[in-house]
Swiss-Prot record:
Low complexity composition bias: residue spans: 817-836
Protein name: Villin-5
Biased composition (Basic and acidic residues): 842-864
Chain's role: Ca(2+)-regulated actin-binding protein. Binds actin microfilaments (MFs). Involved in actin filament bundling, severing and capping. Caps the barbed end of actin filaments and is able to sever them in a calcium-dependent manner.
Disordered as annotated region, ranges: 741-783, 801-895
Residues annotated as domain HP: 890-955
Pfam families: Gelsolin, VHP
Gelsolin-like repeat ranges per the UniProt record: 29-111, 152-218, 274-339, 644-712
Keyword annotations from UniProtKB, A to Z: Actin capping, Actin-binding, Calcium, Cytoplasm, Cytoskeleton, Repeat
Biased composition (Polar residues): 756-776, 867-878
GO biological process: actin filament capping; actin filament organization; actin filament severing
SMART domains, per the entry: GEL, VHP
Length: 955
C-alpha cells in the first residue's frame, strides 16, 4: 500500500516509535493528543484512539490500535475514530491490529492497559463539560458494580437497594469508608479482583486515607460492618433474585458470513468450507462471526479502500443495532490467532514481523538511494548471547535409569552418560534464597520405548508428591533439553543404543540391530556447548553426512582417535572438544583433522566423503511470554489469555500456563485440588497439542510444573516478583483483603526473592577443581562446590545474600584496573584484598563472610577489584604471601615439586590455585617438564596449554 504523507494527519507523525501508550481524543473530527497524566480518564461523550507499542524480543515493535467509543458520543465522531485508526495504521507501516471498544463492553486486552479498571466520567468535549477535580467538590456517595475474574469491568449504578443482587460484586464509596459487598454467587477470583478496584478508589478519591470494609451477602445486622452497610440503604432486607436480562444480540456461533468489499458494496461469498484461499490480496473482506466482526485488508489494497471497508463495518453494525459486537481489523500477514482460528486451515507461513535486522536493511536501502554512505549501518548484527540458565549450579545431583518398571541409581561417574534408547529420572537439589530448592525431571531418549516413558513419568510424579509438591517437575526429550538441564549436568554425553531390559526386548522382537555404544568400536560424536560448564557429546551415525562445519567431532575406532574441527568453529569449540576427548577416550592419543585437510584414513572410517551441512542445528528461541488461565470442564482444556500480566494475576485457586515457545511452565496454586495437581503435567501436554497461539509448538517442548511457593528464578524472571505474596495464607480474596486493609504489602518473616544479576560464564574451569567437589561413590550424591580459594575471595566481593547462579563461580583476572594499580613503592607486602582473603580462612564459622569485621579500606579495594571482573576471563590469580622458609618463583608464588602438584599426588599441596598448578613449578622444573619456558608457554593457545597440562596430570 502506497501512502502519501498528505493523507496522514499531522497528529500521528512520529507515533509508535517507542514502547508505551499514546492516546488521542477526537475533537472537531480531528485527533488531539492528550497528556500522559490523563491516560485512563475517559469521558462518556467522547471517542478516543489508543496506541499500544510493545517492544518484542526480536527487536521489532508491535502496534495495537484501539478506538474507544463512549456511550454518549455521536455517530459521526465514532465513525471518524474508526477511519482515523486506519490512517494511523498506515503511518505505522500497515501492520497493526485495530480494535473497536464500546464503553462497558471493552476487550480484556484494552482493559489490561489501565489496571485495575477504567471509570468513565460523564460529559465530553462536544458538550462543553469541564472536569472537576475530585478534591475540589464534596464527596458524593456512589455505587459501582464489578464483573470479571481476570480483568474488571466497573459500571456506576443507581445508589439504591434495587441495584444489588446475589451474582455480582458491588462497591459502595462513601465519604469515610469504602464497602465491598460480595454477592453470594460471586467467585473468590471476582472478589479478589474487585478489591483491586477498592484500592484504586481509596488511592484516587480518598488520597489513600479511608477505611475499607467487606460485607458478605446474607450477613445480618449482628455484623457491625454489615449493619453499617445496610444502614445506607435504610436497613437490611432480603434481595430478590435477579431477573434474567433479555439479550437482543443472539448469534449463531457456527455460521460465519464472509463478505467481500467490492466497488463500495458488500457482496456475500458462498463457501462450503472457510478456507484461506478465499481471501485475495487486492481486496478487503468482512468476516461476521456474531460477537466479533473482522475486517481483513489485503496487502495491496489502498488506504482509501481500507477506510471504506472500515466505514462499511461500522454501518453494518449500526443498521443492525449491534452495540456489543467487537470489530477487529487485521492486515494480510499480520492476522490475529483468533482470526486464523475461524478458518478450517491456515497455512504455516513465515512471520512478516519486521525484525531489527530487516528494519536496518530497509533504512540502509532508502539512504543508499539518496546517495549516502551506509557502510556502517549494514554491519552484521551482534551475535546472539548464550541464553542464561537462571539456576544455581552448586547443588547436588542424583540420576536413575528406568529398567523394568523400576529405577536404578547411577554411580556418580555415570550420571552424565545417557543412552538414546533409555529413560532417566534426575533430582537436583540446590540452595535457594530461603530454603533448598528441588528440580525433579524425566528425560526420554529418542529411541526409548513407551513403557519406559510412562514409568519415568509415574515414578517422577511420585517423587514430587512425596516432596509435598514443593519440587519443580519437568519433562524433557532428547534434543530439546533446556539450558537449565545442561548447566546442571555440565558435561553430558548421549550414546547410541540402550541398556534397559525393555529396550533390549523391543529391538530383539522387531529384528533391529543392537547399535549400543562400545568403547572399542567405531563411533562418531558431535561436540557442542558454550564452555566447560555446558558441553555435550552426542553420538551420531558414523558417516560423513553427519559432519557439520559449525561443530567439532570425535571419531574413534579402537585405539584410533581423530578430532575434527569445522571451518566455522571457534577456539572455544576446540577447547570443549579437548575436554570431551578426556572423558570419552581419556588415555588415547588423537590426531587432529581440520575441515578441508582430512587424511584418507579419516574418510575411510566414515565410509568415504559426502556432502554435509554447515549451519548450526536450530533450537527453539524463547519468545515473548504469554500467560493463560486454565480450567478443565469434563476433561477438556479451556484457556484464556491474560494480557500484560503481573504476579497478582496468579491466583492460588487456579492453574496457569506461561508459554515462552521454547519452554512451557504450568503454575499450580496452593488452593488447587490435589487431583488437579496430579494432572498438571497432562495439562501442559494438552496445551502443547492445542497450540493456541498457532506457533507450531513441538510436541517435545520442555514442560515445567511449578507449585505456588516453590517458584524457581527461571520462572519468576518473567515477573516483578515478591516471594512474600506466594507465601501468604488463605485464598486470593483473603490475601488481598489483608493487604488492602493493612495499607500495604504483607509483612512476613520470609525474605523476598532477590532479582539476581547474571554475568557471562568463565571460559575455563579446571576439571580437577570441579571433580574435587564430586562424590564418586554410588551411595553418595554428586555435589559441586566452590574451591576454598574462590570462596575466600568471593567473601570480600559478594554480599551476604548473593549466591552463585547458572554458572560456576566467576573468576578474577586482576584485583586492580590498570589505571588503579597501587604504586610499588607504597604497596604493602600483602594487599588489602589478599589480607582479607587469607583472614577469611581463619574466621570462626559463626562469623559470616562480608560482615562488619571488614575494614573500610578493604571494602574500597574489593569494590575496585570487582569492577575489573569480566564475563569471559581465563584465570584466577590469588597472590598469597610466601610462607617462611619456602622458595619463591619469579611471579612471587611459592615453589613446590612436581610430584606434589599433580592431580594424583599422594601428598598434594593445599591452598593453591588449582587452575594454575603449573605456575607453582620452579622455572627449571617447568622447562624440564614442558620443554619450554613459562613465558613461551603463556603465549600458546589456551586449548593447547590445557592439552599439555592434561598429559602432565596438571589439569
Amino acid at each position: 500500500m502506497s501512502v502519501s504523507m498528505k493523507d496522514l494527519d499531522p497528529a500521528f507523525r512520529g507515533a509508535g516509535q517507542k514502547e508505551g501508550l499514546e492516546i488521542w481524543r477526537i475533537e472537531n473530527f480531528k485527533p488531539v493528543p492528550i497528556p500522559a497524566s490523563s491516560y485512563g480518564k475517559f469521558f462518556m461523550g467522547d471517542s478516543y484512539i489508543i496506541l499500544k507499542t510493545t517492544a518484542l524480543k526480536n527487536g521489532s515493535l508491535r502496534h495495537d490500535i484501539h478506538y474507544w467509543i463512549g456511550k454518549d458520543t455521536s455517530q459521526d465522531e465514532s465513525g471518524t475514530a474508526a477511519i482515523l485508526t486506519v490512517e494511523l495504521d498506515a503511518a505505522l507501516g500497515g501492520r497493526a491490529v485495530q480494535y473497536r471498544e464500546i464503553q462497558g463492553n471493552e476487550t480484556d486486552k484494552f482493559l489490561s492497559y489501565f489496571r485495575p479498571c477504567i471509570m468513565p466520567q460523564p460529559g465530553g468535549v462536544a458538550s462543553g463539560f469541564k472536569h472537576v477535580e475530585v478534591n475540589e467538590q464534596e464527596h458524593e456517595t456512589r455505587l459501582y458494580v464489578c464483573t470479571g475474574n481476570r480483568v474488571v469491568h466497573v459500571k456506576e449504578v443507581p445508589f439504591a437497594r434495587s441495584s444489588l443482587n446475589h451474582d455480582d460484586i458491588f462497591i459502595l464509596d462513601t465519604k469515610s469508608k469504602i464497602f465491598q459487598f460480595n454477592g453470594s454467587n460471586s467467585s473468590i477470583q471476582e472478589r479478589a479482583k474487585a478489591l483491586e478496584v477498592v484500592q484504586y478508589i481509596k488511592d484516587t478519591f480518598h488520597e489513600g486515607k479511608c477505611e475499607v470494609a467487606a460485607v458478605e451477602d446474607g450477613r445480618l445486622m449482628a455484623d457491625a460492618e454489615a449493619g453499617e452497610f445496610w444502614g445506607f440503604f435504610g436497613g437490611f432486607a432480603p434481595l430478590p433474585r435477579r431477573a434474567p436480562v433479555e439479550d437482543n444480540e443472539k448469534y449463531e456461533e457456527t455460521v460465519f458470513k464472509l463478505l467481500c468489499f467490492n466497488q463500495g458494496k458488500l457482496e456475500p461469498i458462498n463457501y462450503e468450507s472457510l478456507l484461506h484461499e478465499l481471501l485475495k490480496t487486492n481486496k478487503c473482506y468482512l468476516l461476521d462471526c456474531g460477537v466479533e466482526l473482522f475486517v481483513w485488508m489485503g496487502r495491496t489494497t489502498s488506504l482509501q479502500e481500507r477506510k471504506s471497508a472500515s466505514e462499511a463495518a461500522e454501518k453494518l453494525l449500526s443498521d443492525d443495532n449491534r452495540t456489543k459486537t467487537h470489530v477487529i481489523k487485521v492486515i494480510e500477514g499480520f492476522e490475529t490467532v483468533m482470526f486464523k482460528s475461524k478458518f478450517k486451515e491456515w497455512p504455516q507461513t513465515p512471520d512478516l514481523k519486521l525484525s531489527s535486522e530487516d528494519g536496518r536493511g530497509k533504512v540502509a536501502a532508502l539512504l543508499k538511494r539518496q546517495g549516502l554512505n551506509v557502510k556502517g549501518l549494514m554491519k552484521a548484527a551482534p551475535a546472539k548471547e548464550e541464553p542464561q540458565a537462571y539456576i544455581d549450579c552448586t547443588g547436588s545431583l542424583q540420576v536413575w535409569r528406568i529398567n523394568d518398571k523400576d529405577k536404578i541409581l547411577l554411580p556418580s561417574a555415570d550420571q552424565s552418560k545417557f543412552y538414546t534408547g533409555d529413560c532417566y529420572i534426575f533430582q537436583y537439589m540446590y540452595p535457594g534464597d530461603d530454603k533448598e530448592e528441588c528440580l525433579i525431571g524425566s528425560w526420554f531418549g529418542k529411541k526409548s520405548i513407551e513403557e519406559d516413558r510412562v514409568t519415568a513419568i509415574s515414578l517422577a510424579s511420585k517423587m514430587v508428591e512425596s516432596a509435598k509438591f514443593q519440587a519443580v517437575q519437568t519433562r524433557l526429550y532428547e534434543g530439546k533439553e533446556p539450558i537449565q538441564f545442561f548447566v546442571i549436568f555440565q558435561s553430558f554425553q548421549v550414546f547410541k543404543g540402550g541398556l534397559s531390559s525393555g529396550y533390549k526386548k523391543f529391538i530383539a522382537e522387531n529384528g533391529i540391530d543392537d547399535d549400543t555404544y562400545l568403547e572399542d568400536g567405531l563411533a562418531l560424536f558431535r561436540i557442542q556447548g558454550s564452555g566447560p560448564e555446558n558441553m555435550q557429546a552426542i553420538q551420531v551415525d558414523a558417516a560423513a553426512s553427519s559432519l557439520n562445519s559449525s561443530y567439532s567431532y570425535i571419531l574413534h575406532d579402537g585405539n584410533t582417535v581423530f578430532t575434527w574441527t569445522g571451518n566455522l568453529t571457534t577456539s572455544l569449540d576446540q577447547e570443549v572438544v579437548e575436554r570431551q576427548l578426556d572423558i570419552i577416550k581419556p588415555n588415547s592419543q588423537s590426531r587432529s583433522q581440520k575441515e578441508g585437510s582430512e587424511t584418507d584414513q579419516f574418510w575411510s572410517l566414515l565410509g568415504g566423503k559426502s556432502e554435509y551441512p554447515s549451519q548450526k542445528i536450530g533450537r527453539a528461541n524463547e519468545s515473548d511470554p504469554h500467560l493463560f488461565s486454565c480450567i478443565l470442564p469434563k476433561g477438556n482444556l479451556k484457556i484464556k489469555e491474560i494480557y500484560h500480566f503481573t504476579q497478582d494475576d496468579l491466583m492460588t485457586e487456579d492453574v496457569f500456563i506461561l508459554d515462552c515457545h521454547s519452554d512451557i511452565f504450568v503454575w499450580v496454586g496452593q488452593q488447587v485440588d490435589v487431583k488437579v495437581r496430579l494432572q498438571a503435567l497432562d495439562i501442559g501436554e494438552k496445551f502443547v497439542k492445542l497450540d493456541f497461539l498457532m506457533e507450531n509448538l513441538s510436541s517435545d517442548t520442555p514442560i515445567f510444573v511449578i507449585m505456588e511457593g516453590s517458584e524457581p528464578t527461571f520462572f519468576t524472571r518473567f515477573f516483578t516478583w515478591d516471594s512474600a505474596k506466594s507465601l501468604m495464607h488463605g485464598n486470593s480474596y483473603q490475601r488481598k483483603l489483608s493487604i488492602v486493609k493493612g495499607g500495604g504489602s504483607p509483612a512476613l518473616d520470609k525474605p523476598k526473592r532477590r532479582t539476581p544479576t547474571y554475568s557471562g560464564r568463565s571460559t575455563v574451569q579446571d576439571k580437577s577443581q570441579r571433580s574435587r567437589s564430586m562424590s564418586f561413590s554410588p551411595e553418595r550424591v554428586r555435589v559441586r562446590g566452590r574451591s576454598p580459594a574462590f570462596t575466600a575471595l568471593a567473601a570480600n566481593f559478594e554480599s551476604a545474600n548473593s549466591r552463585n547462579l547458572s554458572t560456576p563461580p566467576p573468576v578474577v583476572k586482576k584485583l586492580y584496573p590498570k589505571s588503579a594499580t597501587p604504586d610499588s613503592s607504597s604497596a604493602p607486602s600483602k594487599s588489602s584484598a589478599t589480607a582479607s582473603l587469607t583472614g577469611s580462612f581463619d574466621r570462626p564459622k559463626s562469623v559470616k563472610d562480608g560482615s562488619e569485621l571488614e575494614k573500610p579500606k578493604q571494602e574500597e579495594d574489593a569494590k575496585e577489584g570487582i569492577n575489573t571482573m569480566t564475563s569471559r576471563v581465563e584465570s584466577l590469580t590469588i597472590n598469597e604471601d610466601v610462607k617462611e622458609n619456602e622458595p619463591e618463583d619469579d611471579e612471587g608464588l611459592p615453589v613446590y615439586p612436581y610430584d606434589r602438584l599433580i592431580t594424583t599426588a599422594a601428598d598434594p599441596v593445599t591452598e593453591i590455585d588449582v587452575t594454575r598448578r603449573e605456575t607453582y613449578l620452579s622455572s627449571a622444573e617447568f622447562k624440564d617438564k614442558f620443554g619450554m619456558t613459562k613465558e613461551a608457554f603463556s603465549k600458546l593457545p589456551k586449548w593447547k596449554q590445557n592439552r599439555m597440562k592434561i598429559a602432565l596430570q596438571l589439569f
